[in-house]
Amino acid sequence: MNDTPENPHVPVGEKLQKVLARLGVGSRRDVEVWIAEGRVNVNGSVASLGQRVDSHDAITVDGHLIRREEAAESVRRVLIYNKPEGEVCTRDDPEGRPTIFDRLPRLRTGRWINVGRLDINTTGLLLFTTDGELANRLMHPSYEMDREYAVRVRGEVTEEMIERLLNGVMLEDGPAKFSDIQQAPGGEGFNHWYHCVVMEGRNREVRRLWESQGLVVSRLKRVRFGPVFLTSELTMGRYREMDQREIDILSEEVGLKPVALPGMTTKAREKAERQQRKQARPLARSERPEAGRKRAPRREDGENAARRAPASRPARGPQPSAERKGREQGTPVAERPRESNRKPRPSKPRDERPASAPGDKPAARKPQVKRRPKPAGDGMRPGFRR
């Protein structure tokens, strides 16, 4: 019988920042900043970075007790949002500009965590989740989640420029490159559309790469994040919530186990259906963000009727450099998924008239005959018969 006591140096419990991230209090990076600022307490004492806690420890953030029982009931939720131009990626803007959180559904517990950022002039795909660990893994460079953008550049683009952007150029914060560049249809004159892929989410990286070649980016839109595509069914300024299958695929990409979703009550299902119909319509002119305009009122929750599952790909995770050598080139521009729910545009009726010759005179227009309105009182009045 071995009477040797257990090793006292074996760590007990789980790291504090990981616990709070999993409960959806914030991303792991956010929690680490809060701990460094002294905003997190454990059992009444200021917490330290890397401190381990168990289920019996009382955790407070800014004086508010984190109720783990209520937080444990929350599930992993993910939103796909089509960000319009003019919205800033912050929760509270001191200038009163619209933010990306204004139109998201309100949560009873936890909060929405944005996966990465887009600058105010960039549109397109943004992901939100209630799982801080999922958000942290999706943003971490070690998981190599590729981002694809549609970009319109102004200026003459040469093959030498494309080669330099693929091989890598030196920016202010270090070397950067595209893993793939494909020319897209559209554009006139010196305006050209391209689809390009980057393997990290550095600040304004796509714009700075094109500008390093003396080109001007006139439009920029993110169209894909890892396996998640932005389809035309999700209109600008709208969002939809991923279903269980989509969340499982996205979670497997970063090595997380699936989390089961609870059944919806009848009242919750009816509310979701109402908001689903509401989210299906495009934004009204008064709802669109504009420069210098004050923040729009918060929209209630809802989801788009159309759902699109992300394409399944091999699972990703932190890999040693030796195993990553074969993927140094990154990923190419992905093939767009078929939008089966999209209705075909009605074809315009062809004009059967013969084409006009250069010397022909324009056809004479028929005179417009103005009809006189009926005289007042002409007709059946309520409550009377003729």
UniProtKB/Swiss-Prot annotation:
All residue ranges annotated as the S4 RNA-binding domain in the record: 14-75
Database matches in SMART domains: S4 (SM00363)
Active-site residues per Swiss-Prot or TrEMBL entry: 119
One example GO MF annotation: 23S rRNA pseudouridine(2605) synthase activity
A Pfam cross-reference name: PseudoU_synth_2
InterPro entries: PsdUridine_s_RsuA/RluB/E/F_cat, PsdUridine_synth_cat_dom_sf, PsdUridine_synth_RsuA/RluA, PsdUridine_synth_RsuA/RluB/E/F, PsdUridine_synth_RsuA/RluB_CS, RsuA_PseudoU_synthase, S4_RNA-bd, S4_RNA-bd_sf
Keywords: Isomerase, RNA-binding, rRNA processing
Disordered: region residues: 260-386
EC category name: isomerase
Domain of life: Bacteria
A GO biological-process term: enzyme-directed rRNA pseudouridine synthesis
Catalyzed reactions per annotation: uridine(2605) in 23S rRNA = pseudouridine(2605) in 23S rRNA
EC number annotated for this UniProt entry: 5.4.99.22
Basic and acidic residues: compositionally biased ranges: 267-276, 284-306, 335-354
Residue stretches of biased makeup (Low complexity): 307-321
Family, similarity comment: Belongs to the pseudouridine synthase RsuA family.
The protein's role, per its UniProt record: Responsible for synthesis of pseudouridine from uracil-2605 in 23S ribosomal RNA.
Protein name: Ribosomal large subunit pseudouridine synthase B
Gene designation per UniProt: rluB
